[in-house]
């Protein structure tokens, strides 16, 4: 079998608040890389403090890609991300740099590196019709409707997961086929790069929980609630009938802040809900990461030496690949 000659890339993965951004910037500066954000919140303009978006100084130090692609009242799909990420990786390689993918959105990683099964594109009119129906009968009734037309998908989708219920019904209404049918079709072509997957995750769950709480407190001190108030004040957001259904507002922390500013509970209760929601997100991320059997796991504090050795060993292949073969 011929050697894999695809350009090399690094994927910095891990649960939220594990230190992915700092490691990605450090690796990019050391090895000559550019960062491709793999985060479903960072694609939205205005989601800065609460999404821990790299600031101007970080972006000046290292080029970042796939930030601020959409306004918060818009939708951005995993298929769009896959196309944009592959374009960004190809451009980075063409400049002689190393793509460093960094983030915590598992579906985006899978879309960019493995491809997605082809399925019907989103139809705004169909989505609006489904949302209007949900206003009348409730999302529970729509989940029951999904169970009748696609029991396989309904078994995987929780009755409160509005976004996935809406997408599954949308696909069926557009194509006449259940989303589970489309998901079994062949995925797209493999990624244009060969990737070293690094997972940053503290060995002690209590350490991660402490980091989550501390980061939220820093965000609050930096003006997170003011940021959400500014989002709420945008005319386009005020025109949305159900803003809590927008992907941007469903981002962890933002939904809880939005509900708090709607008058739901005290500031202390908001903080507790946001911390708990972030812990739950981290748990889901870790569950997904355990399925990445080719990933290498490192504690961000204890395993720095081993992590650096892993990166150096992997990127050492790049020099070998670039050398001309002997005649």
Curated annotation (Swiss-Prot):
Residues 39-42, 163-167 are annotated as: Interaction with substrate tRNA. Substrate binds at residues 16-21. Its EC number is 2.5.1.75. ATP binds at residues 14-21. The record marks 105, 127 as: Interaction with substrate tRNA. GO terms for molecular function: ATP binding; tRNA dimethylallyltransferase activity. Pfam families: IPPT. The keyword Nucleotide-binding applies. It is an enzyme of class 2 (transferase). GO terms for biological process: tRNA modification. Gene3D superfamilies: 1.10.20.140, P-loop containing nucleotide triphosphate hydrolases. It catalyses: adenosine(37) in tRNA + dimethylallyl diphosphate = N(6)-dimethylallyladenosine(37) in tRNA + diphosphate. Catalyzes the transfer of a dimethylallyl group onto the adenine at position 37 in tRNAs that read codons beginning with uridine, leading to the formation of N6-(dimethylallyl)adenosine (i(6)A). Monomer. PANTHER family: TRNA DIMETHYLALLYLTRANSFERASE. Belongs to the IPP transferase family. This is tRNA dimethylallyltransferase.
């Amino acid at each position: 079998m011929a050697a894999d000659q695809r350009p090399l890339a690094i994927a910095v993965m891990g649960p939220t608040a594990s230190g992915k951004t700092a490691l990605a910037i450090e690796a990019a500066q050391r090895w000559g890389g550019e960062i491709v954000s793999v985060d479903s919140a960072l694609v939205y303009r205005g989601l800065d403090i609460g999404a821990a978006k790299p600031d101007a100084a970080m972006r000046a130090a290292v080029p970042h890609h796939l930030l601020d692609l959409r306004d918060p009242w818009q939708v951005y799909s995993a298929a769009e991300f896959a196309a944009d990420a592959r374009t960004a990786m190809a451009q980075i390689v063409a400049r002689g740099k190393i793509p460093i993918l960094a983030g915590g959105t598992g579906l985006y990683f899978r879309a960019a590196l493995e491809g997605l099964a082809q399925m019907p594109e989103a139809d705004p009119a169909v989505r609006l019709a489904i949302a209007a129906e949900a206003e009348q009968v409730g999302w529970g009734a729509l989940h029951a409707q999904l169970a009748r037309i696609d029991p396989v998908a309904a078994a995987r989708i929780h009755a409160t997961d509005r976004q996935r219920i809406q997408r599954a019904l949308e696909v069926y209404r557009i194509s006449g086929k259940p989303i589970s049918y489309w998901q079994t079709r062949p995925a797209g072509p493999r990624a244009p790069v060969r990737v070293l997957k690094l997972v940053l995750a503290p060995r002690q769950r209590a350490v991660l929980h402490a980091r989550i709480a501390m980061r939220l407190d820093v965000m609050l001190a930096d003006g997170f609630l003011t940021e959400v108030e500014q989002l709420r004040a945008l005319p386009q957001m005020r025109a949305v009938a159900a803003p809590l259904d927008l992907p941007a507002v469903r981002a962890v922390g933002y939904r809880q802040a939005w509900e708090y500013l709607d008058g739901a509970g005290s500031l202390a209760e908001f903080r507790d809900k946001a911390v708990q929601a972030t812990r739950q997100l981290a748990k889901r991320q870790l569950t997904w990461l355990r399925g990445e059997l080719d990933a290498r796991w490192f504690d961000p504090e204890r395993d720095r030496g081993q992590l650096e050795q892993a990166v150096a060993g992997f990127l050492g292949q790049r020099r070998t690949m670039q050398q001309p073969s002997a005649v």
